[in-house]
Structure formats: structure tokens, C-alpha cells
UniProtKB/Swiss-Prot annotation:
<dbReference type="GO" id="GO:0070897">
    <property type="term" value="P:transcription preinitiation complex assembly"/>
</dbReference>
<keyword id="KW-0862">Zinc</keyword>
<dbReference type="InterPro" id="IPR023484">
    <property type="entry name" value="TFIIB_arc"/>
</dbReference>
<keyword id="KW-0479">Metal-binding</keyword>
<feature type="binding site">
    <location>
        <position position="38"/>
    </location>
    <ligand>
        <name>Zn(2+)</name>
    </ligand>
</feature>
<dbReference type="GO" id="GO:0017025">
    <property type="term" value="F:TBP-class protein binding"/>
</dbReference>
<feature type="repeat" description="1">
    <location>
        <begin position="151"/>
        <end position="234"/>
    </location>
</feature>
<dbReference type="InterPro" id="IPR013137">
    <property type="entry name" value="Znf_TFIIB"/>
</dbReference>
<dbReference type="GO" id="GO:0097550">
    <property type="term" value="C:transcription preinitiation complex"/>
</dbReference>
<dbReference type="GO" id="GO:0003700">
    <property type="term" value="F:DNA-binding transcription factor activity"/>
</dbReference>
<comment type="function">
    <text>Stabilizes TBP binding to an archaeal box-A promoter. Also responsible for recruiting RNA polymerase II to the pre-initiation complex (DNA-TBP-TFIIB).</text>
</comment>
<dbReference type="Pfam" id="PF08271">
    <property type="entry name" value="Zn_Ribbon_TF"/>
</dbReference>
<feature type="binding site">
    <location>
        <position position="57"/>
    </location>
    <ligand>
        <name>Zn(2+)</name>
    </ligand>
</feature>
<dbReference type="InterPro" id="IPR000812">
    <property type="entry name" value="TFIIB"/>
</dbReference>
<comment type="similarity">
    <text>Belongs to the TFIIB family.</text>
</comment>
<keyword id="KW-0863">Zinc-finger</keyword>
<dbReference type="InterPro" id="IPR023486">
    <property type="entry name" value="TFIIB_CS"/>
</dbReference>
Length: 334
């Protein structure tokens, strides 16, 4: 009986705690209500005017707050160099470095904080400190693996001209593979290339396996096999690549105007609605749509030029553009 009473008491205390937490959350929401919703029209599109220290509703123009705190730095900077010089904090944390960028490095200039040269005795000591610091930064096999793989990822991403978010995503995918011990029995370069390919698809910055293989040190077959393995083991939800994703890059390589690009996207959208892109390589379909659009827009490019930029053959472009023109009733004057 005593145990039953204790359980009832604990349950009542738990319910009371939940109710108190709920009341506090409601009070907090009520306090922040004026900061997230306009009291006049109920709009949520609020704009911070930092010059006037005002919070303004974009829908009705009501000034909700005219004395909010500016939490930015007290100094002013007009370009990137000035911001870097005046900033008193370090670089942000990043997954592209094996220690996430949290460690420091001893400078190699052999000068003190005032710019004066360091004596020979202190110089020898600094040399030894640098050597030991390099050893401490990479202390075990996992960190050595990450240091090599992430530098390889950065090299490949630089060669492909990939943005920062793709590099961060690739580093996270590779770290997850290391945590689940998926590296065993596979080359570091192969897993790194597969992680980069997966990151490109996740971030909708498509690159083909052939493009990844060109900048990596492994074959296309190994990259594809490793990619399928890690995507299955890590449960990566990757949608099929759309031909539309390739259009901006191919049009940029062919120096085509925005009108041609928009028309190519519209052609591909109509082709997708009629299921003309199913079972076909996205690069070939995208190249054919761009070829048709360039002719219709008066900025004709030859099949060879389009094929070189898209990385497909001229035969593929001919087959795809004839199919698109026939099914979509597009009249092309060659």
C-alpha cells in the first residue's frame, strides 16, 4: 500500500510540474507575442530597421518598437577586410576541419605581438612547440583519417567550384560514415568522393559521377558502388536528379541569356508532366532542351558545343531533341 501511495504522489507531482512548465511557456509566448506578430493587422512580416532602432510591420507600416537593442558590434566596417581586422572573435566552427576549427596554430613568422624578431634561443623553443602542436592536433587514427579525408574533400570541391554548403554537407556525411565504421575495407578517397557526390545531390547542386571521378583519385565504378553503400547504410533520402537542376550551369557554360534558360526550363517542365524524362539521363535531356531553346531564342549553339559542356555525345542530343520536339509539338527550323 505504501508503494502505491508513493507512486500516486510521484504521479501527482509530475502532473503539477507539467502544468507549471506549460504555464511558463504560455507566459513566455505572451511576452514575445509583440515581437513576432503585429498587434494592428496580425502580420508576421516584421522588419528590423537598425539605423532608427525600430521594429516595423511590413504589411501595414506600424512601428511596433522604437527602442530595441542593437546586439551587433560597436565598431563600423565598410568592407570584408575591415570587418576581419576589427573582429575580436575567431573563425566559426566548421565540419570541414578534423577538429572543427577549434584548435589554434603557432605562427611561422618568428615575431612577437609587437612585430619584433624573436631571439635564436626562443626561436628553437618555438620550433619544438610547433612540432609538438602538430602531433597533438592529430592524436589518433580516427583524427588522421579525418584530416586526410577532409583535405581531399576540400581539394575536389575546389576543383569542381562547389559552394560552402556542399562542402559542409559532404564533411558531415563522411563523419557519419566514420562514426558507423563504414570506412573499413574501403579507400578513404572512394568514401570521400562518394560523400561529395551525395552532398551535391542533397544540396541540389548536381554533378555527375564522371565529373566527380575526373577530380578524384578513384574510378567512377568505385565511387558509384561506395555511394550506394553509404546512402543505404546512413539512410540518406536522396531524390532523383532533375534535368532542370543542370540547366543554369550548362547555360552559363554556353554564355546563353536568361530568356533561353527560362525557355529550356519550361520545355523540361512540360516534358516532365508528360513523363518524357523518365528512364533517361538527366544531362542528355537537359542538353537537348537547351539546344532547342537556343535555336528558338536566336542564340543557336551547335550540337557539338552543347555536348562538350554537358558531357554527353552528339548522338544523345540528336535523339533527345527529336523526341522532345515531336512529343511537345515544337517546330524547329534548322
Amino acid at each position: 500500500m505504501q508503494e502505491v501511495e508513493k507512486l500516486k504522489l510521484l504521479q501527482s507531482e509530475r502532473e503539477a510540474l507539467k502544468s507549471r512548465i506549460k504555464v511558463k511557456e504560455q507566459e513566455k509566448k505572451a511576452e514575445n507575442h509583440t515581437e513576432t506578430v503585429c498587434p494592428e493587422c496580425g502580420g508576421r512580416q516584421l522588419v528590423h530597421d537598425y539605423e532608427r532602432a525600430e521594429l516595423v510591420c511590413q504589411s501595414c507600416g506600424l512601428v511596433i518598437d522604437d527602442d530595441f537593442i542593437d546586439r551587433g558590434p560597436e565598431w563600423r566596417a565598410f568592407d570584408h577586410d575591415q570587418r576581419m581586422k576589427r573582429s575580436r572573435v575567431g573563425a566559426p566552427m566548421t565540419f570541414t576541419i578534423h577538429d572543427k576549427g577549434l584548435s589554434t596554430m603557432i605562427d611561422w613568422r618568428n615575431r612577437d605581438s609587437y612585430g619584433r624578431a624573436i631571439s635564436s634561443k626562443n626561436r628553437a623553443q618555438l620550433y619544438r612547440l610547433r612540432k609538438w602542436q602538430r602531433r597533438i592536433r592529430v592524436s589518433n587514427a580516427t583524427e588522421r583519417n579525418l584530416a586526410f579525408a577532409l583535405s581531399e574533400l576540400d581539394r575536389m570541391a575546389s576543383a569542381l567550384g562547389l559552394p560552402r554548403n556542399v562542402r559542409e554537407t559532404a564533411a558531415v556525411v563522411y563523419r557519419d560514415a566514420v562514426d558507423k565504421n563504414l570506412i573499413r575495407g574501403r579507400s578513404i578517397e572512394g568514401v570521400a568522393a562518394a560523400a561529395l557526390y551525395a552532398a551535391c545531390r542533397q544540396c541540389s547542386v548536381p554533378r555527375t559521377l564522371d565529373e566527380i571521378a575526373e577530380v578524384s583519385r578513384v574510378s567512377r565504378k568505385e565511387i558509384g558502388r561506395t555511394y550506394r553503400f553509404i546512402s543505404r547504410e546512413l539512410g540518406l533520402k536522396l531524390l532523383p536528379t532533375s534535368p532542370i537542376d543542370y540547366v543554369p550551369r550548362f547555360c552559363s557554360g554556353l554564355t546563353l541569356k536568361g530568356e533561353v534558360q527560362s525557355r529550356a526550363v519550361e520545355i523540361l517542365r512540360q516534358a516532365g508532366e508528360r513523363e518524357l524524362t523518365s528512364g533517361r539521363g538527366p544531362t542528355g535531356v537537359a542538353a537537348a532542351a537547351i539546344y532547342i531553346s537556343s535555336i528558338l531564342g536566336g542564340e543557336r549553339r551547335t550540337q557539338r558545343e552543347v555536348a562538350e559542356v554537358a558531357g554527353v555525345t552528339e548522338v544523345t542530343i540528336r535523339n533527345r531533341y527529336k523526341e522532345l520536339a515531336e512529343k511537345l509539338d515544337i517546330e524547329i527550323i534548322l
